[in-house]
Amino acid sequence: MRLLLALAAVVASPPDVQKLTLTPAQVGPNYVLVQRTDGHGVTNTVTLNVCGAASTYPSESRRLTRIQVDYLKQKSTLGLSNEVVTYRPGGAAQAMREVLQHVATCPKKAIVTDRSLPPLKYTLTRVTGPKLLKGYIALRIRVTGNVQGKKVDQTSYAIYQRKGDVLSGTYSFGPNTSAQLRFALHAAQESALNLRLGRAAGGGPTA
């Protein structure tokens, strides 16, 4: 009986999100992993706010475990963040559906997605790439508006993939160039490999 209980606990426990995050080597040469102050746990943290506040994503309440880390490189304008989240059964699939719904209904006017920021306009464009998990959602996100009197016009990429009840988001930031898109897609391909294997496929330094 004790053995059966132990086996049941192994089956029921969610995957270790830390083992599924990208390694710096997977992101690119000379990138280092940087911890975030909001990088661990689901309390007072946000996973989904694409064209809408987190409160408009009911799947946020179905998260179980979460990690998010950044990857930076000296003298590079391209950076990346990888977020891996486990959900209660069905939660990751629900999260992907909610993202698609927000993409389809994103207002053309400025909206508030974060209480720390003024209303901003979000222009979402679907992009495609090879070697990603079936059902992936890859977005080019252009944000325009004014923050503290300064004009803002930023382009980033967010790529969401799911395997079972695990969701991985890879988020790039940097200049609005084709290089950023290639960078984001490469990271997402590596994340897809991690999800398939159930572990990170490489190594590298942390900061």
Locations of regions flagged by a protein language model:
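Secretory targeting and sorting signals
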Residues: M1-A12
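Short, low-complexity, Pro/Ser/Thr/Gly-rich segments in the mature regions of secreted, periplasmic
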Residues: A187-A207
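Envelope-exposed proteins and targeting segments
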Residues: Q18, L78-L80, S156
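Stable alpha-helical elements in mature extracytoplasmic
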Residues: T23, A92-A95, V99-H102, A184-S191
